[in-house]
């Protein structure tokens, strides 16, 4: 097996990268069989964006504050951990946004796409699902659409539903909804087409973010699940990601 190791700025992560490089050698990202990010979920997310075109599996090693999608490095041989690992396919969301000046932006998100107010005024957003209006006006700080992989990130902080990793469901979640106040969001099929329209965008300007890429002064957003830029992420078979997701739903 050939590995490409990369780490966050965490001193422990850097030290682990050094030790693993001494044990297994360091290969270029193009020559490696596996890409091994050492850090937190943020580093894994960054790696997926940077290297998705290479069609290499990712095996994250946890040295982050949360590391929900990462694996704990045990005394077991790394080769054995990867050989026995469970595979999961991460399909990104493809976001197409239009600015108030009619500029068009595209970006991909493995976690979520969020549309947020960028002034002191609440956003007013019309929501369409599969080209049918489902909400004429959501008054809120914002709204987000999350993948199953991203459902334990920003979506969870916004009180959205946690989704099983293989569920093929998207979570649509309001952020600090004012009207309708009791609306908690919706669970949508992965094949759904979602459209947001910012109402009164001349005075209630909004920005849209796809993972870590932001565009400002947005008037419309279209989101679909995409087969482009899919990634394979590996999980330690002895520490099930499914159990992590289940347990997270009972943490208070």
Residue spans of the language-model regions?
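ATP/nucleoside-binding phosphotransfer catalytic cores, i.e., glycine-rich phosphate-binding loops
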Residues: 107, 115, 120, 133-135, ...
